[in-house]
């Protein structure tokens, strides 16, 4: 996809019962060498990541695990990772000011004009508005980027491509199963 001037990225479904550094290392190996328009890794944290959702782990334990993963992404990939979550889990587990420095990809399937953003964030980078994209032959999510093409380049893994202008602004689609963003 890099040859078609599309941005692409990977995400890690963070598991709380496995070492966060090893999980990040595995994701980085799977992504391979960075190319132009490759986005930094997204850390995905949502209810389905818990083995037993009815037995929520302590907030501090969850926060330590997520922070360890985020810091390791930053150190290893030399870029700022994005956090993907929904409002309920963001409010419950990601309410520490330490998370505000990481861009937010909020899952909020609403018809509203703006998503609900959990504290400590006041804004979002990406908004997943729906789990289906009309007119797509493949299963795809409907995501909106809160910025323009220059802003999107700031999420790149490759420093030289952080200011590319593609002429495309605003809306992204992401294919499930890691195929496209």
Question: What are the language-model segments listed below?
Answer:
Residues 8, 14-19, 46-50, 87-91, ...:
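Solvent-exposed loop/turn segments at secondary-structure junctions
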Residues 76-91:
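Aromatic-lined carbohydrate-recognition surfaces of secreted/lumenal glycan-active proteins
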Residues 60-66, 91-102:
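Conserved N-terminal glycine/acidic-rich loop preference
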Residues 95-181:
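Functionally critical loop-and-helix segments that line ligand-binding/catalytic clefts
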Residues 7-12, 39-45, 80-84, 103-107, ...:
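Structural recognition of the beta-strand scaffold that forms the well-ordered cores
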């Amino acid at each position: 996809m890099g040859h078609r001037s599309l941005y692409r990225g990977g995400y890690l479904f963070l598991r709380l019962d496995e070492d966060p550094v090893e999980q990040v290392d595995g994701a980085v190996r799977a992504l391979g060498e960075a190319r132009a328009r490759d986005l930094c890794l997204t850390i995905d944290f949502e209810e389905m990541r818990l083995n037993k959702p009815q037995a929520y782990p302590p907030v501090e334990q969850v926060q330590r695990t997520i922070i360890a993963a985020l810091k390791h992404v930053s150190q290893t990939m030399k870029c700022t990772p994005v956090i993907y979550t929904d409002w309920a889990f963001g409010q419950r587990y990601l309410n520490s000011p330490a998370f505000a420095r990481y861009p937010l990809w909020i899952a909020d399937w609403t018809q509203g004009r703006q998503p609900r953003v959990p504290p400590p964030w006041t804004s979002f980078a990406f908004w997943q508005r729906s789990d289906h994209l009309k007119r797509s032959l493949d299963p795809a999510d409907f995501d909106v980027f809160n910025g323009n093409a220059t802003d999107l380049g700031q999420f790149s893994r490759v420093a030289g491509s952080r200011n590319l202008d593609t002429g495309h602004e605003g809306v992204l689609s992401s294919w499930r199963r890691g195929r496209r963003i």
